Amino acid sequence: MERIMFRAKIHRATVTQADLDYVGSVTIDQDLLDAADILVNERVDIYNITNGNRLSTYALSGPRGSGVIGINGAAAHLVQPGDLVIIAAYGNFSEEEARTLEPRVVLVDAQNRILDLQPA
């Protein structure tokens, strides 16, 4: 049996932009994607700490060192610049893999610079 497990998150990121007219997705600073081991086009869930909204979308790469967290498309109705969010990724793992999984947690400051990397 495979289990769907939490494997990575970017915790308490600040949304820097929202573009209702863009065709879906979330744009994330490539440094943050690398730190969280989230790939371009990978499905991610976004949990809005500010207002409680939740949504699923896919990740796009933003410029390295920019701190960009850009909510694109219809999701811009649910998340606004300045909101705090958690961006989480999940994966399918065998029973054995699931029991030894150590998720990556990327903690960031108000400018979305990496403060710490830790297991969940």
UniProtKB/Swiss-Prot annotation:
Active site: residue positions: 25, 58
Note on cofactor: Binds 1 pyruvoyl group covalently per subunit.
A molecular-function term among this protein's GO annotations: aspartate 1-decarboxylase activity
Pathway in which the depicted protein is active: Cofactor biosynthesis; (R)-pantothenate biosynthesis; beta-alanine from L-aspartate: step 1/1
The keyword Metal-binding belongs to this UniProt entry's keyword annotation: no
Any one Gene Ontology BP term: alanine biosynthetic process
Stored InterPro entries: Asp_de-COase-like_dom_sf, Asp_decarbox
Residues annotated with Pyruvic acid (Ser) modification: 25
Cofactor or coenzyme needed: pyruvate
Residues holding substrate: 57, 73-75
Post-translational modification summary for this protein: Is synthesized initially as an inactive proenzyme, which is activated by self-cleavage at a specific serine bond to produce a beta-subunit with a hydroxyl group at its C-terminus and an alpha-subunit with a pyruvoyl group at its N-terminus.
Record Pfam families: Asp_decarbox
UniProt keyword terms in alphabetical order: Autocatalytic cleavage, Cytoplasm, Decarboxylase, Lyase, Pantothenate biosynthesis, Pyruvate, Schiff base, Zymogen
Catalytic reaction(s) noted: L-aspartate + H(+) = beta-alanine + CO2
GO cellular component, one term: cytosol
Location in or out of the cell: Cytoplasm
E.C. designation(s): 4.1.1.11
Subunit and interaction comment: Heterooctamer of four alpha and four beta subunits.
Function noted in UniProt: Catalyzes the pyruvoyl-dependent decarboxylation of aspartate to produce beta-alanine.
Stated family: Belongs to the PanD family.
Name of the molecule in the record: Aspartate 1-decarboxylase
Organism per entry: Deinococcus geothermalis (strain DSM 11300 / CIP 105573 / AG-3a)
Lineage: Bacteria, Thermotogati, Deinococcota, Deinococci, Deinococcales
Gene label: panD
